[in-house]
């Protein structure tokens, strides 16, 4: 709540400082390679991964929401239905990753078409792009890599989908995981080539690493900088690192994902575009499903059906719901030079659902909520501030826990007494590890 903002901020800063020291001595990354994975919006419903059995304990019956990382097998994409249906008050909140990935790919393609006469910097007839991959085992990263390759025609089929494997260096076009494509604009034919792509993982094992992306663009440009016409990134953290390190000065179009505040502001300085995950809707849904479960009202209250305060979202425009997997997905929006001024404050609550709930019908309740990596730009600088605004509006006393981005135990060790909380919101380090949390609730 607002009176606790200072305390919350201090707590987060302390956790962030701790996480930095832990990253330096961490033992390994938090992901595994994925040969084929479904996206976070529509993973393959399957009972192949059902490690989160409910014991019937008091804590196991409390409201639970998984958010941002959908319980699933990181190698196959199969959803962990045991975790998603842990009890009758369990839900998942994320965003439609396939829709957003396709939107990013189309945004890049549209830009190339509109600027084909000037985008080929060295005039060799090849429009070359580089791609920063966040995490080869993360469904969202996989979807975004596929979305770009599908839109640009550089994707190669593998196991019924577009191969998302990093091409590494491919300046000669010989890589097997991608292919050269052709694009005709105004009677002229161009070749499109993925010059290089790489998973941005640091030496401590943390993925989606902005510093690694900044260093990598330096390596790429030193070797083949004159061939790079477009820079694409799985997220804005890495995209902005490459933009600031090289492409801003060289006026090379750069595209990211997340609509982080710094990235949106950078559009005025040449950052070409990003995708809004509708984080304001995601954060609202994360707490709203808990609030509804705690109040014992219909889960659609304040979501698809207006509540007494007038809060309501538009299904099909703001979000979609998949009943089988009990999953809510926010819908994405493209942010470009044409509309970026509408997205300059990424931490502002979404106006249609920014009305205060009545404390007499929605009394104060205590919620335990973790952010898997206190150093993650999107989650810590955008998502958590939104949550902190919404928790006031929903009369929820939320304890925010920041992880190190590497180990589940760094988070679960701080859930020592679940009985003191009324509900739980969980953001895992690895999508495979739902049982690390439910085993505690089962006690």
Model-derived features: positions:
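Bacterial Sec-dependent N-terminal signal peptides
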Residues: 1-13
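A residue-level marker of the well-folded mature domains of exported/periplasmic proteins
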Residues: 2-5, 25-443
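Short acidic (Asp/Glu) patches
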Residues: 16
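Bacterial Sec-type N-terminal signal peptides, specifically the leucine/valine-rich hydrophobic h-region
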Residues: 19-22
């Amino acid at each position: 709540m607002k009176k606790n903002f200072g305390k919350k901020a201090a707590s987060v800063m302390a956790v962030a400082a701790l996480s930095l020291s832990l990253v330096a001595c961490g033992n390994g990354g938090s992901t595994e390679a994925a040969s084929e994975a479904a996206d976070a919006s529509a993973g393959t419903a399957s009972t192949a991964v059902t490690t989160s059995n409910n014991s019937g304990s008091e804590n196991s019956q409390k409201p639970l929401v998984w958010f941002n990382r959908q319980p699933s097998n990181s190698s196959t994409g199969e959803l962990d239905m045991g975790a998603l249906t842990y009890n009758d008050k369990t839900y998942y909140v994320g965003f439609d990753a396939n829709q957003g990935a396709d939107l990013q790919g189309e945004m890049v393609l549209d830009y190339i078409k509109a600027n084909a006469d000037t985008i080929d910097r060295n005039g060799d007839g090849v429009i070359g792009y580089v791609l920063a991959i966040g995490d080869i085992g993360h469904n969202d990263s996989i979807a975004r890599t596929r979305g770009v390759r599908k839109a640009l025609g550089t994707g190669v089929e593998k196991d019924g989908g577009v191969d998302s494997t990093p091409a590494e260096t491919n300046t000669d076009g010989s890589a097997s995981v991608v292919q050269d494509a052709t694009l005709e604009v105004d009677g002229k034919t161009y070749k499109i080539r993925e010059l290089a792509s790489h998973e941005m993982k640091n030496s401590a094992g943390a993925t989606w690493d902005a510093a690694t992306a900044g260093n990598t663009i330096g390596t790429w440009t030193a070797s083949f900088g004159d061939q790079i016409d477009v820079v694409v990134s799985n997220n804005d953290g890495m995209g902005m690192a490459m933009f600031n390190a090289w492409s801003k000065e060289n006026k090379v179009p750069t595209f990211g994902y997340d609509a982080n505040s710094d990235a949106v502001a950078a559009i005025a300085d040449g950052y070409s575009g990003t995708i809004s995950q509708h984080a304001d809707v995601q954060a609202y849904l994360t707490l709203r499903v808990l609030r509804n479960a705690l109040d014992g009202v219909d889960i659609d209250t304040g979501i698809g059906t207006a509540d007494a305060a007038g809060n309501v979202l538009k299904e099909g425009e703001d979000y979609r719901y998949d009943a089988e997997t009990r999953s809510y997905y926010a819908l994405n929006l493209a942010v470009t030079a044409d509309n970026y001024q509408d997205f300059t404050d990424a931490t502002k609550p979404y106006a249609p659902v920014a009305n205060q709930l009545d404390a007499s019908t929605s009394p104060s309740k205590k919620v335990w909520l973790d952010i898997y990596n206190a150093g993650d730009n999107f989650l810590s600088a955008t998502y958590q501030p939104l949550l902190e605004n919404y928790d006031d509006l929903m009369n929820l006393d939320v304890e925010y826990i920041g992880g190190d981005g590497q180990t589940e135990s760094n988070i679960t060790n701080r859930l020592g007494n679940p009985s003191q909380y009324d509900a739980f919101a969980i953001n895992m380090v690895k999508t495979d590890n739902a049982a690390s949390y439910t085993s505690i609730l089962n006690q």
